[in-house]
From Swiss-Prot:
Subunit structure: Homotetramer; dimer of dimers.
UniProt GO cellular component terms: cytosol
Name this polypeptide is given: 4-hydroxy-tetrahydrodipicolinate synthase
Function: Catalyzes the condensation of (S)-aspartate-beta-semialdehyde [(S)-ASA] and pyruvate to 4-hydroxy-tetrahydrodipicolinate (HTPA).
SUPFAM superfamilies in UniProt: Aldolase (SSF51569)
Catalytic residue list: 133, 161
Underlying gene: dapA
Site (Part of a proton relay during catalysis): 44, 107
Catalysis performed (reactions): L-aspartate 4-semialdehyde + pyruvate = (2S,4S)-4-hydroxy-2,3,4,5-tetrahydrodipicolinate + H2O + H(+)
Species this chain originates from: Shewanella sp. (strain ANA-3)
Broadest EC class assigned to this enzyme: lyase
GO biological process per UniProt: diaminopimelate biosynthetic process; lysine biosynthetic process via diaminopimelate
Binding site for pyruvate: 45, 203
Molecular function terms, GO-annotated: 4-hydroxy-tetrahydrodipicolinate synthase activity
PROSITE patterns recorded: DHDPS_1, DHDPS_2
Amino acid sequence: MINGSIVALITPMNSDGSVDFASLERLVEFHIDQGTDAIVAVGTTGESATLPMNEHVTVVAQTVKFAAGRIPVIGGNGANATSEAIELTKSLSKVGVAAMLGVTPYYNKPTPKGLVAHYKAVAASTDIPQILYNVPGRTAVDMKPETVAELVAVSNIIGVKEATGDVSRVQRLRELCGNDFMLYSGDDATAREFLLLGGNGVISVANNIVPKAFKAMCDAALAGNAELAASIDEPLRGLYSTLFCEANPIPVKWAAHRMGLIECGHIRLPLTELSEQCHGLLLDAMTRAQIEVK
């Protein structure tokens, strides 16, 4: 099973909006070098909403190619039409991903019954492990632990990314879903507590720019060393909040560009590049986190 420090990888782009595959390869190498445990390709932070399906699949496939078996790659397969999610899942099943991460259908606000039916249909279209993804701040639907529990019996649904920031859900999910079901935090600010309460890993935005420190924090928390985890995590807390001064992934792409990790901080419309009033805030947070900028 995939656990530990997982990066929700940005998708680097050129100034004309095309995907910058040279920078993508460098990012993959960077995370392998820094000890990141796994990569999520083309999730929310990877701008899945603005990549058409053929491009989405290509980016995931290239990420797998660059990883070359050295780090697991999880492909984003969420969509708000079940038929589209199934089509995407079938395509991603051919490119070598270790698992897939499927966000709850957004905008159309399915009922719990609809969520269960959606995920069962998607899981039935592949043998590859599936991770559910609950982020109501983005989707306008909150998949409760009781709904997640209805999907545990599906053999290739292996876990859930819980991004509400409500750490009380860890215990409830564990009670309902059992010890073998993987619980991933999707909220950097509460990730340490999530792991200390029994979570298995974190799918992180900040991990794009502080992978070594984030990996060390996750390892300490998973080992039950709360004091060490806190000592690593506390200097990063300003970064966690500032990376959401505007909609993710606007700030983290700007930060990655300032670090020289990517050639350009371009982001696709309707998102726009980081506003000037946030530049100083983010630079200050990066300095406090001991991040070097170029």
